[in-house]
Structures are given as C-alpha cells and as structure tokens.
Amino acid sequence: MNGSRIAAVGHYQPAKVLTNEDLASLVDTSDEWIRSRVGIRTRHFAGPDEPVDELAGHAAAKALASAGLAPADIDLVLVATSTAEDRSPNMAARVAARLGIPSPAAMDINVVCAGFTHALATADHAVRAGAATRALVIGADKMSAVTDWSDRTTCVLVGDGAGAAVVDACPEGAEPGIGPVLWGSVPEMGHAVRIEGTPPRFAQEGQSVYRWATTQLPAIARRACERAGLTPADLAGVVLHQANLRIIEPLAAKIGAVNAVVARDVVESGNTSAASIPLAFSKLVERGEISTGDPVLLFGFGGNLSYAGQVIRCP
C-alpha cells in the first residue's frame, strides 16, 4: 500500500453569530479588549437543540458529498470531541446513525484541541494496515456548552462548529497524501487546559499555555515537516489549532513556513477546540487558497498539553 490521503473535506457552523459587542452585554469586556488580546471578532454558537453529533453530521455529510460517496462506503468513523453530551452511545455511533452508515467501527477520540490530528493519524494507520477502506474523520465541539459565562478570560475565546475529512487509500503509484504523525504530550502540565467539574467547565492557565506553545512547539512542528521529507519553506499552507491570534502568529513565524498561507479562522470562528483545524482547513480549500496536491501542515495542540502534527496533501 502506498499510503492514505484526504479525499475530501467539509465543515459546518451554527447560524447564530455573536460579536464582541454582544459579549460585552454579558460580561465586563469590550471589542477592543478582546481583539487586542486574542484577535477574535465573532464566533458561532449552537442552540440548546443542536447537539454535537448534529454539528458533526452536517460537516460529515458535506465531506461525503464532496467525495462522491454514499454513507455505506464508509467503514470507520472517528470523532474527535471533548464536549459529548453523553458517554454512550458515543458521538461516532450517533453520527453513523444520523448519516445511515450501516456497520462501521465507530470511536471517539478525546485529545481536546489536538483531537483531530490524532484522529487523522489513527485513520491513516487503519487504512494503511488494511483495517479500514474509507474513514470519516470528524472534529466537532460545542464549547459554548462547557463555558463559564462569568469568566471573561475564557468565554470570549470559544465557538462551536465541526469539520470533517474522508480518508482513503492513495491511487496506485501515488505518493502518500498523509505524512507521518509526530505526537506527544506533557502530562505533568495537563492541568493547564481543563474541562472538569459537574457540570463540566472549560478553564486554562493562559500564560503557561502561551509560553509552551510559542517556545516548545515550533521545533516539534518543524520535525513533523522533516518526517514528511520537507522543510517549512516547502509548505503551501499551515493550519494550526485556532487557539487565538497571540499564539498562532508567533508560532507560525517561528516554524518558518515563509511561503505558506496561514489559517486565521479564529478571527471569525473563535476557538472551536477539536473542530478548529478541519474547519479552518476546509475553508482554505473552499476558497481556493490552497490547491490540489499542495503540502499543508496540520498541527494540533492544547488539552493535556498534547500535540500532533502531520503534513498532508491538499485534496
């Protein structure tokens, strides 16, 4: 087997949009305060009648349509999320039922903001090993449901949404479309990003996360490029976890992808956790900012102080 590839992508965001001015009516904040600290202008929020699997299902349906596939063509469903409403049935099974996928392996992966790139690597390994033929990989989170709306340092960050990718085998003779993953974590610092308590609430130690992301992750991201046989200058695109602009911009600069389009979807969508990478990537594809075959670094990081990155070829 030559390897696997991303055959198609899709994304979905709820219709409700909150501006910084809207948030200023809820907590002690302002448009200037938010934009100067995290670079976010707007975010999308799901309603109480829009569960996570509905967001995921919409994105997945778009990816399937783009790939020209029927639900029955999928035999593996992976959903990266940390905001599932229930422990069982899991989100992957719920999405499969929603879409009419008849008998897939269905698994959730909870690595918070790095979940999608972990799930993508898992799908790549499954397809290359022959354990799956076509995988549906989804990142979906409803961060508004786990937000403390009295904490202005976190409630201004979050948004809801989903992104999805179809992963299948590369055509005969083609180069692998998903490069080797570089992943890991810093367990002793896992408390720096948390969703805990009853009901669960998102909290983080912002300065610790910022220092880790901007000092430790650039070298790791460059190593992910090396594993794909590339340098950062070879990249056409960089899609980092959309944490906030104060992290994205220095991290991208230190990686050294001088010729790449850098996704900044956080400005319009906020931090959507596991959804942020597939959501931003799908938008770059949709807008034509990256082209078929272009090398793109996907690099997730966050909760558990986990990270996972790989270079993929644009579908």
From Swiss-Prot:
GO terms for biological process: fatty acid biosynthetic process. It is an enzyme of class 2 (transferase). Belongs to the thiolase-like superfamily. FabH family. One of its GO terms (molecular function) is 3-oxoacyl-[acyl-carrier-protein] synthase activity. Residues 242-246 are annotated as: ACP-binding. Keywords: Acyltransferase, Cytoplasm, Fatty acid biosynthesis, Fatty acid metabolism, Lipid biosynthesis, Lipid metabolism, Multifunctional enzyme, Transferase. Pathway: Lipid metabolism; fatty acid biosynthesis. The active site is at 113, 241, 271. NCBIfam families: fabH (TIGR00747), PRK09352.1 (NF006829). Pfam families: ACP_syn_III (PF08545), ACP_syn_III_C (PF08541). One of its GO terms (cellular component) is cytoplasm. This is Beta-ketoacyl-[acyl-carrier-protein] synthase III 2. It catalyses: malonyl-[ACP] + acetyl-CoA + H(+) = 3-oxobutanoyl-[ACP] + CO2 + CoA. It is found in: Cytoplasm. Homodimer. InterPro entries: ACP_syn_III_C (IPR013747), ACP_syn_III_N (IPR013751), FabH (IPR004655), Thiolase-like (IPR016039). The last Arg residue of the ACP-binding site is essential for the weak association between ACP/AcpP and FabH. Catalyzes the condensation reaction of fatty acid synthesis by the addition to an acyl acceptor of two carbons from malonyl-ACP. Catalyzes the first condensation reaction which initiates fatty acid synthesis and may therefore play a role in governing the total rate of fatty acid production. Possesses both acetoacetyl-ACP synthase and acetyl transacylase activities. Its substrate specificity determines the biosynthesis of branched-chain and/or straight-chain of fatty acids. Its EC number is 2.3.1.180.
